[in-house]
Amino acid sequence: MLILNSGRWPASLKFVFVLPLFALAVGCNANDQEMVLKISWRDGFFSQGFPTDLRNDDNRIDVGGFPRPLQLFSLTYTRQVEQYDFGYSPAMPLYMQFGSGLAMAEHIDTLNPTEFASELAPVQVIDIDPDSPDYGARYPLAVAMTTEADQYRPQNLLQVRPVGKPLRENTTYAMVVLRDFAGNAAEVEPNPELTALLEGRNPWSVNPLLLWTDAARARQVYAPLAEFIAAQDLAVGDVIGATVWTTGNPSRYLKNLVANVSQWQPVPADAWLLREETADYCVLESKWEAPVLQKGAIPFVTAGTIDFDDQSSPVIRRTRTAPIIVTIPKQTMPAAGFPVLHYHHGTGGLATQVFERGLTAADGSQSYLGSPAQVAAQRGWATTAMAGHLGADHQEQLRLLDTVLELIPGFTLNHTTYNFLNPKAMRDNFAQMLAERTLYRKLVMSLSLDDSLCAAAVSGSGEFHFDTGHQAVMGQSLGSMTASASAATDQGYSGLIATGAGNYGLGLALFYSLGESDVGALIENVYLNVEPGTVTSDLFHPVWALAELVLAPANISLLTSKWLQAPEQAPPAPHVMVVEGHYDEQVTLPMQRPYLISLGADFMNEELDVPESSQLLPDLQIAGYEQLFSPVAGNRDGRTVGVVRYEEDGIMTGHHVTFQYPAPQHQYGCFLEDLAQGLTPTIIVGSVLGSACR
């Protein structure tokens, strides 16, 4: 009898015996058309699909193995993901890898996104959470597949983006690929480990060399999908790919921040003074000490984060002197006080823009005509504004930094808000803005102003004050983002007016143009080390997925979507009017579309005569929203929610149409007039500033 002494086997003989066993253990498949599913010993970032709950430990996401791990972006963002427990964002791309032998069927590229929202679709994203109100729902999708490997992605990587209504937080989803996805559908055999999981079995039963704990974990992760398949009596043998993941709750970050800050008592403002008057309103000015929550030195090359105490309340580091403005309409104040429009300026803006920012003429001069204060005053509304964090007023206070920034044409301190080099600071720059505006609003609503400051207005009591029951919030550009987040986290706004509006995220840097300079191309080339256009032209790119994992807590669409998805988790939803322009070089279409979809905005009136790729209407229709024609009121479950769109005027770009045209000014003026009268606001066909609404 021959007995082999394992301790004396030649190394080459050991290799011969061990290699097949190791290959089996890691799931090395004989069929190169299968989904790549490495339950044990991952082989590449996408070898279990992504996102997947195989990488989710109580909302702490394992991003180990992300491509190009030593590249600065990858290194910075993966480290930041690992520090937090926000979980998977509902707004990120999805990935599934197949073997090199599988070819996507030719007809997949011809399918409309809405055709994927079907139980017969070759690729499906399904809500499989039995506690979800959308259980069983399928979503419109954008689908693509890599044909060759690149710096970030392997060959045959299926890439999917849900493009309809947003996915929910704290909800379990599955991405399922059916046999018809493959060009050679009849020949494709599913991965046996995947089949076992979909049948509710432990994959160890088909591959006993998997690590037992990994196999048991995989069975647990796939159990909701196995139960869904059994309940729906679906054919497991037709499923050639599947991933399961549970979204996290990143929106809790800003909600918690506002909930705590709104309980603080703001320090009183300095004495109010009459600054100037127009025919429609008086301008009052003061100063206020705004709390600074971020630690470190501006512009936050490092640090820039907010710390929280044991009660989850943000820690105040210091204060900043902020100029503040109130405008009083030259009218008789209602008994409850003037209705008030809280205005948030945009990037590089000033508190005074609430009354100074009107029409820009061809020679570059700017008048007060059509300013928010004028539009509001004509309808009986007061306005208020503050100098925001990193805005132009703030920049002037930082003398040395201001001197340096003056040497860079078109660049301001406020542009450092989008500090993609330090994403925690980018997130918390937005959080700081939201926090200080929350507290400033509380200050304003407690004011009693001597009516002698505006003799042409009548108070009836000797003091001006503001009606807590009639408040709206308006913002331009970055201000539209803070305004939207304010309305979605702080109670009491009956209206939201967002202009030049969109999402907050990495796209604000990558899609940005500064004059004739393509800032995004420079970032791609220098920071991401890819050819310009590689990331910006490809919304499936893994850079977007990783960035969203870090910046999701500041993604305002996750907040505004609550008004439709989970109204019990948000303040009462306001009426919403959005004004967009073409071409907007600052808040571009990839940032506008998900924001508008999250609101449930219908498209008002005619779409612009631009290529379909530059339109908004098709994307809103994919999400289930409509094109309506003015007058429109109460179109979204009794609320008015709509977007109007204008072509640029030839003087300013489309980003500024609200200030360049009387039509949108007429529209949002009537929106405010209706709110003040307690009516459901109507979005009309705009014409002349200040003219009648009916």
Task: Locate predicted features.
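N-terminal secretory signal peptides that target proteins for export/translocation
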Residues: M1-A11
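Cap/lid segment of the alpha/beta-hydrolase catalytic domain
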Residues: I298-T321, M333-V458
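C-terminal subdomain of alpha/beta-hydrolase-fold enzymes, centered on the catalytic histidine
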Residues: Q159, H342, A425-Q432, S494-R694
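Domain-level recognition of soluble alpha/beta enzyme cores
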Residues: D270-M333
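Acidic, low-complexity Ser/Thr/Gly/Pro-rich repeat segments typical of extracellular/periplasmic
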Residues: D32-I298
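Primarily recognizes the serine-hydrolase "nucleophile elbow" in alpha/beta-hydrolase
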Residues: L449-F511
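C-terminal motif of bacterial Sec signal peptides marking the signal peptidase cleavage site
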Residues: V26-G27
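Short, solvent-exposed loop/turn and secondary-structure capping segments
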Residues: I108-N112, Y135-R138, N170-Y173, N184-R201, ...
